[in-house]
Design a protein with these regions (language model features):
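Hydrolase catalytic cores
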Residues: 1-62
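Extended recognition patches within non-cytosolic domains
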Residues: 15, 19, 78-86
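Active-site/binding-pocket entry motifs
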Residues: 26, 77-78
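Loop and turn regions of beta-sandwich accessory domains that flank beta-strands and are enriched
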Residues: 62, 81-255
Length: 255
């Protein structure tokens, strides 16, 4: 970054990021997605992607949640910078909030399909990043897979299942009650849609992928003391309450 800035001091941070992303080299190209298999409540086996490997978005850019856009190629980026056209001014759309009707927001335990909610973006923008906030009720957050699907069909995992959001189970074990019902305006950001068209339908999907109890070992870093935490399955379905979408990008007509 410093080398690029010294060679081309007039380029903005957004332009530098654009150059780095478009000229990066894919490493560990054989990286495979992490698949999560479970038996749905209807008895049918189901498999979902809990963490993506390398995937190419609709703008033709490769992206991995592990490696981002890839390894920086300094020489290639410097060469491209010589003929780079600066990006149009940044546009940050207001957050579009979607309140989900109760009849549509139930998150089934080990569901045979995802709970879905959609919103439309009318503006013709080229995406640089997408910000999502989510509010939902659920008694065991590590069961949840949260994904965002773009108008072009690109799918980005925003929250991985088997995550470390174990505070509810810890409260239940240590306090006898739970202080939180789930997520409230949890903010998540995705760069996977970089370069895609923002206009069209964006869809949020939430899936509960587990109904089995789990045991975790917790380590106190101060005392090195170990304790066991039992995560019991949620006793009732979750509920998607609301979510919002905010697109950050630039005028597609000026790209």
């Amino acid at each position: 970054m410093a080398l690029l800035m010294s060679a081309y001091p007039d380029l903005s941070v957004r332009d530098l990021r654009d150059l780095l992303a478009r000229n990066a080299t894919r490493i560990d190209a054989g990286q495979q997605p992490v698949q999560v298999s479970y038996t749905a409540a209807n008895g049918q086996p189901r498999q979902v992607t809990g963490l993506e490997g390398w995937e190419r978005n609709a703008a033709g850019l490769w992206y991995s949640p592990t490696y981002g856009f890839g390894l920086i190629d300094v020489n290639k980026t410097l060469t491209a910078a010589a003929n780079h056209t600066p990006l149009p001014p940044l546009v940050q759309l207001p957050a579009q909030k979607v309140t989900v009707p109760r009849s549509e927001g139930s998150i089934a335990d080990v569901g045979s399909s995802a709970t879905r909610s959609s919103t439309q973006v009318a503006q013709a923008l080229t995406v640089e990043a997408v910000q999502v906030t989510v509010s939902l009720d659920h008694q065991r957050l590590p069961d949840l897979l949260i994904e965002l699907v773009s108008p072009s069909g690109t799918r980005s995992v925003l929250l991985n299942p088997n995550n470390s959001l174990v505070g509810q189970s810890l409260d239940r074990q240590q306090l006898g009650y739970v202080r939180t019902k789930g997520l409230r305006d949890m903010r998540m950001l995705s760069h996977k849609f970089y370069g895609e068209a923002a206009q069209g339908e964006w869809r949020l999907e939430v899936t509960d992928v587990s109904n089995s109890s789990r045991q975790l070992t917790l380590v106190d870093l101060n005392t090195n003391r170990r304790s066991t935490l039992t995560e019991r399955n949620n006793s009732q379905p979750g509920q998607l309450l609301n979510w919002s979408l905010r697109v950050i990008g630039h005028d597609a007509a000026r790209s």
